[in-house]
Amino acid sequence: MILSAQEKPEGLFINSKAPDFKAIDQYGKEIRLKDVLKDSAVVLIFYRGQWCPYCNKQLKKLEDSLQLIKEKGARLIAITPEKPEYISKTIEKTKASYPLIYDKDMKIMKAYAVTFEVDERTVSRYKNADIDLAAANGQKEKVYLPVPAVYIISKKEGTIVYRYFNFDYKKRASVQEILDQLK
């Protein structure tokens, strides 16, 4: 993927106030960040979609370590641009039991500054591999994805205390790195 300097998102930085959001998870339950933060810290994951083997590997490892994350006083929430029918495929592949949220219109992703436009050449390459990003994400003219990112948001204060943000989608924060950052 080719990104110009102007198009490159930077993500939010440590000590930034985490933008509140309200969305529906795969179980039809409303998740509101500020309500979750009353009782626990939040590990917020942005992932590209069920078609991405790197995302699936990360989400599966997080599911396998979910109890350890909970023991550290945190809840895990994952955000994707993919529509609910594709989220069900993510669940099949990863066994994820934590909230997976379809970010309709990418409002959450934009608030966290992780969104970028996918160039036409890349969209075409994915389409040739039977991955229709526009259809999966409910997008019409342009296709957008998130930079895979992890934010740890502090309980009560709601500030970002850890971030992992890397344009190289093959590189992800390890579960151990996330656990080490949870107090």
Spell out what each predicted region is.
Residues 5-34:
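N-terminal "domain-start" segment that seeds a small globular fold
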Residues 106-168:
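Thiol/selenol-based redox catalytic cores and closely related redox-interacting motifs
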